[in-house]
A protein has these predicted regions:
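Acidic, surface-exposed loops and disordered segments
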Residues: 1-200
């Protein structure tokens, strides 16, 4: 069954090489799910309108983040919301990639509280934080907001400017706000299904 489906997707992908993912879905499902539509429409937003995000939207994003799955449900993750001039100025010392967003979600983890794979000692803290971050981005998109994953920041500056984060490893920053820019051209450039998936 899986082999036939992958072959069908591969054939379609060859016909529509580098085409939008929706073209493939037209041949495999009667109607894309709401989540696939959301995933397709979300993009990394690097320009924001100069207006605040309502408190109820911030709460909704935090709730989506709180509900994110983590390994063994250990939840070694914390989210901080930066939305004041002073806090944003401090974050701006650590990265140039805030893009004028009205608020930033800071996601951190504690490796010593995370699940560890016994076979090789792989720590799941950063993976857990990444899942939380993905929930932040997807909920923001569902609310009509833009977001972008920012991994380019100076951890030493973060530590110096925010001593209250001691003991936490900051994984990513998520500027969020009302989008004012279009997706980058490369956003729609996806691997073909043949390149992306295969039978094991």
């Amino acid at each position: 069954m899986a082999k036939k489906l992958l072959q069908k997707l591969s054939d379609i992908s060859r016909i529509h090489h580098r085409a939008a993912f929706t073209d493939v879905l037209k041949h495999t499902a009667p109607k894309p799910s709401a989540f696939l539509e959301l995933a397709r429409n979300r993009y990394s937003c690097r320009a924001f309108e100069d207006r605040e995000v309502p408190a109820n939207m911030v709460e909704s994003i935090l709730e989506a983040a709180r509900l994110a799955p983590t390994a063994m449900d250990k939840q070694p993750v914390h989210v901080w919301v930066a939305d004041t001039g002073d806090t944003m100025e401090k974050l701006g010392k650590a990265t140039q990639y805030l893009y004028g967003a009205p608020l930033v979600f800071v996601v951190g983890c504690k490796p010593d509280e995370a699940w560890v794979r016994k076979y090789d000692g792989k720590n799941g803290a950063e993976v857990d934080a990444a899942i939380v971050g993905t929930h932040i981005m997807m909920e923001a998109a569902d609310l009509g907001l833009g977001s972008v994953w920012v991994g380019s920041f100076d951890p030493a500056v973060i530590a110096a400017e925010f001593p209250e984060l001691e003991g936490w490893e900051v994984v990513a920053l998520f500027p969020v706000g009302y989008p004012a820019g279009a997706p980058a051209q490369r956003h729609s450039e996806r691997k073909s299904m043949e390149e992306f998936a295969s039978e094991l």
